[in-house]
């Protein structure tokens, strides 16, 4: 039986995410699974991100369901104290590499990126990405070849920027239906950076949407069946502050099910991109 590629994408958006990485790495070591970690660089403005929900009555229910207390004292980052995400704990980022996982870049200044990307031109976006690459390399020494836009925020200017900077692949799209890796089209030409989409909402997002544990497990199983039938790479993603900090038991169960399913072969996103380029 032909195996379907499967990947675990971990988004590190804040210092709180960094603080929970050791627990996540222990789990991955136990399961013998390699993951791709997309690390945000620049200032941690978590307090501003939470504040926008408090000041918007329409978002209050979503805010409560998101379990804001999961961030603990890190909720003050960006308001009462300054913290750089990539320097919050350099040792744990080095451990990611030491244990054979992949590190990619998740933008620079996560809060400002999501808030302002749509108004940025290509030059400004390239400047921010270059700042991020420099910051992450200074801590890890890694040659960063993969990218993931915070909030799955995409513009034509952004696509041109990652193309110009020569990334091997990027993961900037999410679809609840099978979507093969693809090369997007800008208004002027086809992009040369392969996109590897995420396959479904995270566990945390599904909880906020009202799903129960059993419904999330059922949705995961159904999606695995559909993606395998289509032979499309199955990519799940998580945030340590959510899946590790709040839903560790369910998250562990989901990863174990995926690891033990003989229909799937665990790969990093870089490995999926490499294999797909050979295929096409």
Question: Where do the protein language model's features map onto the residues?
Answer:
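Catalytic alpha-helical scaffold of carbohydrate-active enzymes acting on polysaccharides/glycoconjugates
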Residues: 1-146, 151-194, 214-236, 243-280
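Positively charged, amphipathic and often flexible ligand-engagement surfaces
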Residues: 196-208
């Amino acid at each position: 039986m032909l195996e379907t590629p499967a990947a675990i994408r971990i988004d590190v958006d804040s210092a709180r995410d960094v603080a929970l990485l050791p627990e996540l790495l222990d789990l991955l070591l136990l399961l013998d699974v390699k993951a791709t970690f997309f690390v945000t660089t620049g200032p941690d403005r978590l307090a501003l991100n939470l504040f926008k929900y408090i000041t918007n009555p329409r978002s209050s229910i979503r805010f409560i369901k998101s379990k804001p207390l999961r961030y603990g004292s890190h909720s003050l980052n960006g308001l009462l104290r300054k913290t750089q995400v990539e320097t919050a704990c350099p040792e744990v980022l080095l451990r990611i590499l030491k244990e054979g996982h992949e590190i990619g870049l998740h933008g620079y200044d996560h809060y400002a990126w999501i808030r302002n990307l749509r108004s940025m031109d290509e030059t400004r976006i390239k400047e921010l990405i270059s700042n991020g690459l420099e910051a992450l390399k200074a801590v890890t020494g890694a040659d960063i070849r993969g990218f993931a836009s915070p909030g799955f925020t995409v513009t034509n200017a952004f696509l041109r920027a990652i193309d110009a900077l020569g990334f091997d692949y990027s993961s900037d799209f999410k679809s609840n239906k099978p979507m093969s890796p693809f090369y997007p089209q800008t208004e002027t030409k086809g992009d040369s950076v392969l996109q590897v989409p995420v396959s479904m909402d995270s566990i945390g997002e599904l909880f906020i949407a009202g799903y129960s544990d059993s419904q999330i497990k059922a949705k995961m199983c159904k999606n695995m069946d559909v993606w395998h039938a289509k032979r499309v790479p199955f990519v799940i993603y998580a945030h340590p502050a959510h899946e590790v900090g709040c839903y560790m038991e369910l998250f562990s169960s989901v990863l174990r099910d995926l690891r033990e399913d003989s229909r799937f072969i665990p790969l990093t996103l870089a490995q999926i991109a490499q294999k797909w380029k050979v295929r096409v």
